[in-house]
Amino acid sequence: MQVTVEATGELERRLTITLPGSDFESKVQERLRSMVPRIKMDGFRPGKVPYKVVERRYGSAVRQEVSDEFVRDSFRDAIKQESLRPAGMPQIEPPQLEAGESFAYTVTFEVLPEIESVKLEGIKIKQPRAEVTDKDIEGVLKKLQEQHIEWEPMERPAQEADGVTITYHGSIEGKPFPGGSKENFFVILGKGTTLKEFEEHLIGVNKGQELTFEITFPEHYGNQELAGKKASFAVKVISVTAPRLPEINEDFAEKLGVKEGGVAALRQEIKASMTRNLEQAVRDRVREQIMDGLLVANPTTLPISLVKEETSILLEQAKNNLAKQGVNPQEISLDESPFVEQARRRVALRLIFSTILEKQEIKADQDKIKQRVTELAASYEDPEEFSRWIFSDRERLSEIENAVMETQIIDWVLDQVEVLDKSMSFEEVVNPQISSAKEKVQD
């Protein structure tokens, strides 16, 4: 086998692979002769069809079949011989199959960039230091109260923050319009869930009151068919209710699933959950900083084919997410450009991580894999069944192994770089938007 390698770009390679034509022809004849005993054809006894007849009938298909095998096997041997690492699918120009000539073909593909070593210079990690305080717990309790608000009927006029249940019928120029009528529609005044002008007409209404008013839809209203148009609404007020926060007591704790221990046990569960969230948020922040640092310290040319492949995956995920929300992806055209940068980031990190795994000889820690599965199983009704489900499927287990190896890579980098403690509050750690805004103010 003769192999010539041509660099047609920074990462693109063009291979010309030549094999003796006699080897190809011999393999074709061998394949055809092996078929003769099995061939049944009108006018001939089973297994007695002449070779020439078999060749005439099946020769073309067999030559293509053998050609595919020669290409597959020789390409594999060629990249091994030339120490090449293909990235993405190769583009193969069909070989010439003329009898008696050499079996030659060309294949074009990108190779993975050579990263001799992963640089860590300049990477500094700010590791958050925070704890769950009583104030944080009180904040969660407050949110839980708000999530379980009880609405108390009122005989007074509706005011800001009240809940008003109404039935309304809307029309434009005397004609009903799609979505313009609702029965028993509940709206919290001042919450902003409906048009502000619509809500303003409900301030001061009483139970049983009927009223008619007009509003003008905003010019940039979501439904363009209604944007800028004036609509008339006939409204009947079914009820006016005021929000009442439930007391934080044993009944409230039971309602949240705490059967024993009352409020004290509820606080303990909240703190334990918040602590887990805090620990995960710290890991996520450190992980993101390490990834950002690795990308800055190790710029590299990326294979276009891998970036395109990753972009397609992200685009497909976006379509699936839309489908879950009830949107038909076929009815909209998603632009792939917003996904390209994310795809480039993923491909670059995959190459860097792969180099670290290879150079540092990092293997998936089996104890950590078992620990990870146990942690995931803890949230299921039957943890043992979940664990068996994970370990019984190679693909599912592979996902766990990859996650564990990524953690091992992060831990290795963390041991090599400068780590600075940064005091933060619980909210700043778990809500990046808060800390980001605070940093901008300080800057």
Swiss-Prot record:
GO molecular function, a single term: peptidyl-prolyl cis-trans isomerase activity
Domain (PPIase FKBP-type) spans 161-246
Query: Which EC numbers characterise this protein's activity in its record?
Result: 5.2.1.8
Which reactions appear under catalytic activity for this entry? [protein]-peptidylproline (omega=180) = [protein]-peptidylproline (omega=0)
Q: Say which domain of life the source belongs to.
A: Bacteria
Q: Which Pfam families does the entry mention?
A: FKBP_C, Trigger_C, Trigger_N
Q: Say if the entry is tagged with keyword Chaperone.
A: yes
Chief location: cytoplasm
Q: Which Gene3D superfamilies match?
A: 3.10.50.40, Trigger factor ribosome-binding domain, Trigger factor, C-terminal domain
Naming one, the record's GO cellular component terms include: cytoplasm
**Domain text from the record?**
Consists of 3 domains; the N-terminus binds the ribosome, the middle domain has PPIase activity, while the C-terminus has intrinsic chaperone activity on its own.
Function statement: Involved in protein export. Acts as a chaperone by maintaining the newly synthesized protein in an open conformation. Functions as a peptidyl-prolyl cis-trans isomerase.
Question: What is the similarity comment for this entry?
Answer: Belongs to the FKBP-type PPIase family. Tig subfamily.
Report what the protein is called: Trigger factor
Q: Which organism is it from?
A: Nitrosococcus oceani (strain ATCC 19707 / BCRC 17464 / JCM 30415 / NCIMB 11848 / C-107)
